[in-house]
Each structure stands twice: as structure tokens, then as C-alpha cells.
Swiss-Prot record:
Disulfide bonds: none annotated. Pathway: Amino-sugar metabolism; N-acetylneuraminate degradation; D-fructose 6-phosphate from N-acetylneuraminate: step 3/5. One of its GO terms (molecular function) is N-acylglucosamine-6-phosphate 2-epimerase activity. This is Putative N-acetylmannosamine-6-phosphate 2-epimerase. Converts N-acetylmannosamine-6-phosphate (ManNAc-6-P) to N-acetylglucosamine-6-phosphate (GlcNAc-6-P). Its EC number is 5.1.3.9. Keywords: Carbohydrate metabolism, Isomerase. The keyword Nucleus does not apply. The gene is nanE. One of its GO terms (biological process) is N-acetylmannosamine catabolic process. Belongs to the NanE family. It catalyses: an N-acyl-D-glucosamine 6-phosphate = an N-acyl-D-mannosamine 6-phosphate. It is an enzyme of class 5 (isomerase). GO terms for cellular component: cytosol.
Length: 235
């Protein structure tokens, strides 16, 4: 297991991860399209993938050899935890071909304790990624032996989500010797570079690569702003 961990972490530390998660129920939300996104991402230079859902993971796995971070998202009635909340999710992700399994690592009410999920994932021979929202959560998981600490949920457990990524969070974790996966609002190449400069071992990029609806929305907003500015200048 030790050599497998080193091999996977070394691979991830060479670049960035493409999170191939289309908008739910959108026109791109089909396993065959997710697989195409994944293959195109690898051809473009991604050294890892983050894939949500068993059907999508099964569609992607035969076509790529790079490490895959697998997750299952659920909307629970009694918990705000969405990412891989159950033991059965962990087992299904392993069977579908995930190398790394990411879990919600926040200190919120949850159906299964973080410790149990971590233990199960590692017993199956997979690495764990802790999707954290705070330094305390990240360090708790680091103390459990979690291999990858992600900044994934920073800004998403509070009333207001910042526009910029959480660079201080990256720096704090890196200073403690964590393998840091920067994730969350890294929507430009420059921000991805700044994450590495802040101490991240790797960066996960999602919407800016694989969510066409979001990308078009960004351009739409800027073009509309430009039109308004032109009107002001004329006035």
C-alpha cells in the first residue's frame, strides 16, 4: 500500500486534476459525454480526474490510466453533507475503479463518522481525500492519516461564498506538511499557478474546464457589463 500511495501522490504532484462534473440534468450530463470530457482533459495535460457518480466513473475508467478521484453526491434530508456520505458509496466507488475516494470532511451532522469512512476507504486499498472547509477539519483528517487534504469546501459552508479561492487555507495546511489539493474557485490558469505558489501540491479545476453553462455565463456577464459601460461613455 505504501508504494501505491507514493506513486499516486507523486503523479498528482506533477500537475492538475480536471473535475469532469457537468451541470446536473444539463445537456452534457451523460456518462458518454463525461467520458469524452475526461479523455479530452487527459489529452490536454490533466494528470488526474475527479468524477462524480458510479455510471460516470464506469464510463471513464476503461479509457484513462491517470488517477481518478471518485465521489458520490447525495441530497440528504437530515444532513448538509453531500459528498460520499455512506459506506456503501465508498464500496461502490472502489468497485467502479476509483483510485482515490473523496469525502465531505466537515464537522457537520452526518450519517457516518469521518473516522469510519476513512478506515473503510483505506481498508479497500484506496487513498482518501478529505474535502475540508476549515484548517481544523483538514488537520483532524491529517491526524487520521488521510493522504490528501482538499480545500474543496472552503467558503461553501458559510452564508456567503467568497469570489476568490482560499489561499491562506492552502498555506496553513502546507506549512503542516499536508499534501494539499487546492480546490474551489480556481477558475483561471493564473489562480491555479498561484495555488501552487501558495504551497498546494496539486490543483483541481472544475467549472472553468467542464461546465460550458458556467463559462458562457461568465462571458455573458462581462459582455453585458461592457455594453453598459459603452452606454455610460456615450451619455
Amino acid at each position: 500500500m505504501g508504494s501505491n500511495i507514493d506513486k499516486t501522490l507523486n503523479a498528482l504532484s506533477q500537475g492538475f486534476v480536471s473535475s469532469c462534473q457537468p451541470v446536473d440534468d444539463g445537456p452534457m450530463d451523460k456518462p458518454e459525454i463525461v467520458a469524452a470530457m475526461a479523455m479530452a482533459s487527459v489529452e490536454g495535460g490533466a494528470i488526474g480526474l475527479r468524477i462524480e457518480g458510479i455510471d460516470n466513473l464506469k464510463a471513464v475508467r476503461p479509457h484513462v490510466s491517470v488517477p481518478i478521484i471518485g465521489i458520490i453526491k447525495r441530497d440528504l434530508d437530515d444532513s448538509e453533507v453531500r459528498i460520499t456520505p455512506y459506506i456503501e458509496d465508498v464500496i461502490a466507488l472502489k468497485e467502479a475503479g476509483a483510485d482515490i475516494i473523496a469525502i465531505d470532511a466537515t464537522h457537520r451532522p452526518r450519517p457516518v463518522p469521518v473516522e469510519e469512512l476513512v478506515k473503510k476507504i483505506q481498508s479497500l486499498g484506496c487513498l482518501v481525500m478529505a474535502d475540508s472547509s476549515t484548517y481544523e477539519e483538514g488537520m483532524f483528517c491529517h491526524g487520521l492519516g488521510v493522504e490528501i487534504i482538499g480545500t474543496t469546501l472552503s467558503g461553501y459552508t458559510t452564508p456567503v461564498t467568497p469570489k476568490e479561492p482560499d489561499f491562506p487555507f492552502i498555506q496553513q495546511l502546507a506549512n503542516q506538511g499536508c499534501f494539499v489539493m487546492a480546490e474551489g474557485r480556481f477558475n483561471s490558469p493564473q489562480l491555479a499557478r498561484e495555488a501552487i505558489e501558495a504551497g498546494a501540491s496539486c490543483v483541481t479545476v472544475g467549472s472553468a474546464i467542464t461546465r460550458i453553462e458556467h463559462i458562457c455565463g461568465w462571458f455573458k456577464s462581462e459582455v453585458e457589463l461592457g455594453k453598459k459601460n459603452m452606454v455610460k461613455d456615450i451619455a
